[in-house]
Amino acid sequence: MPRKNKYEAQLALINGENVNVGTKSELKDFVVLLGGLVGIVIIFLLSFNVVSDFFIDRMSTESQLKIESLFKGTQNKKIPDKYKQQIFLLENIKQKIIENDISIQGKSELNISVLEHKEINAMIKPDGSILFTTKLLDENFPEEELAFVLAHEIGHYSNKDHLKSISKQIAYAIICTIAGLDSKVNNIVQGVSEIEFLSHSKEKEKEADMYANKMLITIYGTNEGAKNFIKKLQNKDKLPEFVHYFSSHPSWNERLKLIENN
């Protein structure tokens, strides 16, 4: 068998057993690049959040109301007759909460309206209004339990979370725009951003729970409404505990322990 010259030997090296040498090098470079990209995204998000939260927390009432006015849409639909009594009750509870929190006095009217939805939920909108889903109202929770839900949403308003969530969306949009030229890079950025968002959101939910817990004790002298509401939803929730790791809210068990220990 004739001996291969050096060019044939190099070709055999490329096509033969040792071709994985270059693959290992490329894999190492990819891991380094990926780690650097993840690090940059995390640093950017943390820095952006710290800076934006700093200015939002110190925002004047006038500036806050101007920003909220930018998100005011069309007037909410008329409240159905079947929910009017509950909304009237919630409006009275709202006034008691405002009386006990100077930080929200003179700001949004915190208008309460009804949203047709099949899930038990409530939410604070960027304009400072609050939505209660029809499913939540259909459950006919007692006053103190409704008060906990309302106080939780007003807690978000007091902490200006409704504005901070906008800044998070802006940060995410900036990163996606920069990385948008490459779908693979964009997927990585999206994944890292969502993990950071979920972690940040869970902390905000705990703060809102603590606000609501304190408000119930102030108004009713007890936080039984908070504990009872959480227990009821905990019994309705059939998802395994670990699933809440991927949720924007802490698990019901975590929330109950937080309330019981404070």
Question: What name fits each language-model region?
Answer:
Residues P2-N262:
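A Zn2+-metalloprotease active-site environment signal
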